[in-house]
Each structure stands twice: as C-alpha cells, then as structure tokens.
C-alpha cells in the first residue's frame, strides 16, 4: 500500500487557502484538511478549492475538505496559517499580542490530539509563534519550524536578478534572522554561478556601483508595498510552504533558510531565528553554520536579542 500524504492547515484565510491551492496544483499532497474557527468559511474554501481538482493545472485527484483537530492524529504535516493580516504601517512584531492569544487557543486543541508529524508555521510574528508553540507542546526542534526568512530570500533573489541580469535560479542568496525588520542579507555567502558576489563586483564595474544598502532596502520594503497595496501577502509565502512540504515528502535535503530553535549555533541559545538548514524527511535535519563576517554576526545577534525578548514575553502570557 502506498502512503497517503496528509496535510492539515490551521487557518483558511488568504495564506492557508493558497497553501492548499499550491499543494493541489503541484500534486504534493493527497489529503488536505482545512481547520478554521470560522467553520463555514473553511467549508466554503474547501469546496472552492475542490473545484480546482477538475482543472487542467492539477496533477492528480487530491482530496480536500474542512475538518477538526482530530484529523491531526494521522497527519504527516501541520501548517499553521492562523491569524489576521498585517495592517498598513504595522510591523509583524506589532501583531504579537493578538497572535499569542490565537496561538494559545490553538495549543489548547493540539494538546487534545496525538500529532506525530512535522509542523511548519507561517503565522506572524513567525519566529515567535512557531517557537512558542514548540515550547508549549514540548516538540523536538527538527519537527517544528517556520518559513522564517523565506520571503525575504525570495525577494532578495528577485532584486539581485533585476540588478545583475542573471536569472534567479542561477543565484544562491538568502537572508537570516527575524522574519521582519531585523532580518539581513548575508552578502558574504552570495554566489552567482561559480563566483562569489564579491568577486563579480570586483570584475564588473556596473556591479561594483550597486548600493548594497539600496538593494537590502528594496528587499525590506517589498512586504510593506504589498500590504499597503492589497492588504496582505499570500502567494509567495504559500509557495515557500509548499516548497518545504515537497522537500519533506521527497526527502530532498533542500538547503534553505528556515527559523528553528538554536542551541549554540552562531553563538545563540534560547531563541529561534532564520538560518540556513537542510530540510528532508525528518524536517530540519541540519543547521548549516556559515562563516559570517563580523558585521553579519553582529546583525544576527541583534536580531536574536529582539526575538528572545518577545519569546520571554510570550512565556508569561
């Protein structure tokens, strides 16, 4: 018997529904369950998504439906996508109080089931919500992580491609730290083809003329532009979640920045932050420690300090 790949998504709003759509269209899940406090909405989203299964873009006949937390007892992957959208002018950290209340409600349901799979969290503030849930549930760090700086890294690839003329898939680049304002570009690790970005800048005057500060600002402002213009972000982050789910189901050993609990890596403990990881069938299978510059180390430490402070607050609520 072939195993059915079952994914449960908590939160059937903009992000959760698009994660489901990405899974349906990519064929990366066989059984998809939507859970939402608004049960009629979850049922309606599931019905609408089920209509897609008949379409030409769907690779196979995935089953999708609304359900309850008991569905987690035999689920492979749990995606946390609950919470409201970020408002214009608001940072992800500004969502802390509302999101922690929702997280604690979700935790009360999780404690009533026997979930043994892998959790991928998207709900903002992403690093904090994910690690808060992990600690309350006493889950192993490898099976409880969040999309972290995936969006920042996607945006960085877009910005670098536009600035250099190289296609995105030829560029290796990512951001580290908080999924938020204290994230930063790891310039020292960027490679295009077989060359480092620093080497290419030394060889090409037009690349040397690029302002790294301006490029990083473009990465950071992208989310604000999207939220100001449409009220949310949904497509990119859903794609990132689907990519991670695929890496787990296919044991791809994908190297990608995710937010996971740190135990001495990069000199940090008692915090979860975005770092390059190896993702496979066991979730986070390895944390890759890069040789950061002194400035990059300082930025990462500062980002971790911010996250640690909010995690301490979450523990007291």
List the predicted regions and their residue ranges:
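Conserved N-terminal Rossmann-fold NAD(P) cofactor-binding segment
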Residues: 37-74, 308-315
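N-terminal Rossmann-fold NAD(P) dinucleotide-binding loop
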Residues: 16-17
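Rossmann-like NAD(P)-binding element
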Residues: 57-117
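C-terminal substrate-binding/catalytic lobe of Rossmann-fold NAD(P)-dependent dehydrogenases
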Residues: 137-143, 152-317
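Glycine-rich Rossmann-fold phosphate-binding loop(s) that bind the pyrophosphate
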Residues: 12-13
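Aromatic pocket-lining residues of Rossmann-like dinucleotide-binding sites
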Residues: 23
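Rossmann-like NAD(P)(H) cofactor-binding subdomain of soluble oxidoreductases
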Residues: 91-157
């Amino acid at each position: 018997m072939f195993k059915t790949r079952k994914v449960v998504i908590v939160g059937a709003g903009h992000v959760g529904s698009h994660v489901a759509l990405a899974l349906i269209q990519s064929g990366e899940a066989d059984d998809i369950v939507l859970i939402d406090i608004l049960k009629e909405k979850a049922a309606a989203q599931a019905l609408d998504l089920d209509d897609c299964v008949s379409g030409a873009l769907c690779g196979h006949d995935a089953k999708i439906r609304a359900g309850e937390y008991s569905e987690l007892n035999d689920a492979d992957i749990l995606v946390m996508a609950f919470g409201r959208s970020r408002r214009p002018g608001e940072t992800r950290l500004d969502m802390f109080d509302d999101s922690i209340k929702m997280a604690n409600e979700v935790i009360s349901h999780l404690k009533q089931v026997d979930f043994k799979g892998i959790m991928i969290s998207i709900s903002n503030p992403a690093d904090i919500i994910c690690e808060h849930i992990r600690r309350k549930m006493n889950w192993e760090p490898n099976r409880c992580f969040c999309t972290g700086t995936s969006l920042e890294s996607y945006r960085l690839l877009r910005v670098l491609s536009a600035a250099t003329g190289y296609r995105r898939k030829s560029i290796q680049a990512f951001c580290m730290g908080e999924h938020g304002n204290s994230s930063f570009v790891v310039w020292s690790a960027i490679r295009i083809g077989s060359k480092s970005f620093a080497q290419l800048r030394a060889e090409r005057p037009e690349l040397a003329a690029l302002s790294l500060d301006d490029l990083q600002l473009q990465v950071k402002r992208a989310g604000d532009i999207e939220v100001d213009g449409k009220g949310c972000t949904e497509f990119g982050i859903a794609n990132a979640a689907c990519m991670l789910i695929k890496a787990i189901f296919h044991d791809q050993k994908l190297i990608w920045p995710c937010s996971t609990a740190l135990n001495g890596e990069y000199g940090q403990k008692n915090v979860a932050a975005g770092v390059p990881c190896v993702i496979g069938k066991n979730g986070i299978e390895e944390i890759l420690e890069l040789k950061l510059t002194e400035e990059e180390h300082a930025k990462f430490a500062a980002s971790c300090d911010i996250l640690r402070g909010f995690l301490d607050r979450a523990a007291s609520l």
